[in-house]
């Protein structure tokens, strides 16, 4: 008998709980709305308009509020990871907007040193990879300067001679091919040495020197082969 009475009491209590219970649909906004703090913006109220827009509008509300939310809300929200990602993205964008102008100002202020660093970057890499090659690169301008200086030292007497005595410098220029010929062909240079008095005699008279230049092949032929030169003279006399 006691068991039946206890069973009836249990059924009565269960029926009372069922009668007083409120069933919330899965897409209903009532559980979330009841957990939202009262100080959030009024945009939260518009979430209940359409359940399909619940996650999107909730993200907008969180981004606009920038206020810590209740832990129960995050437990009830199905878009927890998406909301957290959105909040982190918004904070990163805000930080970027604050920091980017400062970076631009620093870059503009230090544009010249930055440009110089970019120009010297290959040399720095070369010095790290191959110190010997980097040292040669550093000495290259000095090598070029030494070569140019050596050439200037060789030409210095001629330059001084040209400044002090233009006539003597002109004679040096006339005799320069003979000096080169002496270095290349000694026999031809000896022949030229035999003709040197004629060059010195007619150096002051360009017209006579030009005639001598025209007669030079015949003179060289006379020195190297007198018989052939004599035949040339006979043939020339017969023609004229």
Swiss-Prot record:
Keyword match Endoplasmic reticulum: no
Keywords: Repeat, Seed storage protein, Signal, Storage protein
Domain of life: Eukaryota
Record flagged with keyword Transcription regulation: no
Entry-linked InterPro entries: Maize_Zein_Storage, Zein
Molecular function, one GO term: nutrient reservoir activity
Annotated Pfam families: Zein
Signal peptide interval: 1-21
Subunit structure: Interacts with OP10 (via N-terminus).
PANTHER family with a match to the protein in the record: ZEIN-ALPHA 19C2, ZEIN-ALPHA A20-RELATED
Family note: Belongs to the zein family.
Miscellaneous comment as given in the Swiss-Prot or TrEMBL entry: The alpha zeins of 19 kDa and 22 kDa account for 70% of the total zein fraction. They are encoded by a large multigene family.
Free-text function comment from the UniProt entry: Zeins are major seed storage proteins.
Designated name of the protein: Zein-alpha 19C2
